[in-house]
Amino acid sequence: MTAFRRPARSAAGALVAALAVTAIAAPALAAPTADDLAVPRYAHVFVIVEENKDYAQIMDGANAPAIVRLAKAYGSATNFYGEVHPSEANYVALVGGDTFGIHDDDAFFCMPAQDSGDCSHAKTPGYANHTVDAPHLGNQLEAAGLSWRGYYEDIPAPGSLATFATAPGGEAGGPNAALYASKHSAFLNFRSAQNDPHRADHLVGFSRLDADLASGNVPSFALVVPNQCNEMHGAHGPGIPADCDWNDPSATIRRGDAYVDKLVRKIQASPVWASPDNAAIVITWDEDSGTRVGCCGSDPASAANFGGGHIATVVVTNHGPRGVADPTPYNHYSLLRTLEDAFGIRTYLRHADDSAKGVVPMLPLFRR
């Protein structure tokens, strides 16, 4: 396991840093559109993120019958795209509205020219600081008096700053054999999350997810990230199960599909699903297998959106529409904008504000 620890800082220093984030990168004030205003308020939204699969690999149904069943019964965004490759920046885009120039899977603490095995691309020209001084969705929610939490299967401990980790008692190994990977955290790339005094309550494991669902005490926004065997990413090395080997994508899809089905059923069995309040589960992917197609302002020269491929995205709601196949072009910025609307936040983070480029809320899938 590789871990990173920052030096302790004073309370005054933490306050100055927090104020700097707000001052440097406050979200643009944009007038919401009629569609933004039409998105109903949601009490709870769970976003489950899977990995590295093309739209057709999932939606042809051969290896993902549970996900296809959910798509047909509830709703599917049939033209949804990632922003870039590889994984890490798409997670950052989902909660921050930008890739911030990150175009690799180096650790969240990496800086230009840094000598570290976790920062293998750091001497590449134009390398971006992987710790971002900008607000994220969690900051917006807290400012609105709402709650958020990231649930990560096999995170070593609540609030952990480990870059990779195996499950307790699991096989030792490096990144290729890791079950938990901080590159899929989304939030840890933000300085405010790294320095969050409540980080151990905001970045937690799946035992906390089980407890929260059983009690019904779940946050407004929940990012749910299975381990690399259960999110279709796969792994490679000694002790890796056959259905987790990334050289067998059909097997990793079947395993991930069964796991997503279990997660969705668990959420639907929670008291929050039976509530009169609106709740939703979004199942999406970070990127496809490597194509550079995109939407909503995608440009080969864009650091924020050069195209992360056509990916499946399914929206399951407790009170919303049924049987919807929505062909509107969307990406993770569209999903972020939809989340902001659903929680009554009318300021859109960075590229979530790109309505002129086609970044619009996913209203047909969330309307009631």
Describe the function of each predicted region.
Residues M1-A30:
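Secretory targeting and sorting signals
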Residues A30-R368:
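N-terminal pro-sequences and low-complexity stem/linker regions of secreted or lumenal proteins
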